Amino acid sequence: MDEDVLTTLKILIIGESGVGKSSLLLRFTDDTFDPELAATIGVDFKVKTISVDGNKAKLAIWDTAGQERFRTLTPSYYRGAQGVILVYDVTRRDTFVKLDNWLNELETYCTRNDIVKMLVGNKIDKENREVDRNEGLKFARKHSMLFIEASAKTCDGVQCAFEELVEKIIQTPGLWESESQNKGVKLSNKEEGHGGGACGGYCSML
């Protein structure tokens, strides 16, 4: 059934409670937005197949609770992940400041040294911004992460965040091949895509 799928990738979404992790996931997988969405209890899980540079990848996306009382679940959902999306709310500086804690947790429990990280500043549709875009970009560069600002509400930047993350994973030797039965798929080298298209001006490939 999935003969044309290059690989299955495990993607995590982490960050403080209320930053919009579930909203980003629902916008990406179902193209829906619910302003009254309840906080995630434990771990939610969705699957979506996307095509990047002509290669199909099935994403198993784990949406995690930000609350401290659910941290006992941590080791199991970090295990085997190839990509992680760290989310903060651009209107809440505290969620940006606490990114260091999430990075420390990632380093503690992640089983791969070459996991690809994407930093997402969410809720750019709101007026009361507390974290400047350049601050996010600087933090991402410091920690060798991809970076994008997004809005789950307006859909701005959401698709790009996931696509750029997957593209980087596929371009990283040894990160996913063991999961794909060595199908010998030839990867295309698409340099021009970073200058325009749907993702133009958003992502910084680091």
From Swiss-Prot:
Its main location: endoplasmic reticulum. A motif (Switch 1) lies at residues 31-45. It catalyses: GTP + H2O = GDP + phosphate + H(+). A lipid is attached at C203 (S-geranylgeranyl cysteine). The keyword Membrane applies. InterPro entries: P-loop_NTPase, Rab, Sigma_54_int_dom_ATP-bd_1, Small_GTP-bd, Small_GTPase. Belongs to the small GTPase superfamily. Rab family. Switch 1, switch 2 and the interswitch regions are characteristic of Rab GTPases and mediate the interactions with Rab downstream effectors. The switch regions undergo conformational changes upon nucleotide binding which drive interaction with specific sets of effector proteins, with most effectors only binding to GTP-bound Rab. Its EC number is 3.6.5.2. Regulated by guanine nucleotide exchange factors (GEFs) which promote the exchange of bound GDP for free GTP. Regulated by GTPase activating proteins (GAPs) which increase the GTP hydrolysis activity at the ER membrane. Inhibited by GDP dissociation inhibitors (GDIs) which prevent Rab-GDP dissociation. It is found in: Endoplasmic reticulum membrane; Golgi apparatus, cis-Golgi network membrane; Lipid droplet; Apical cell membrane. It comes from Gallus gallus (Chicken). This is Ras-related protein Rab-18. One of its GO terms (molecular function) is GTPase activity.
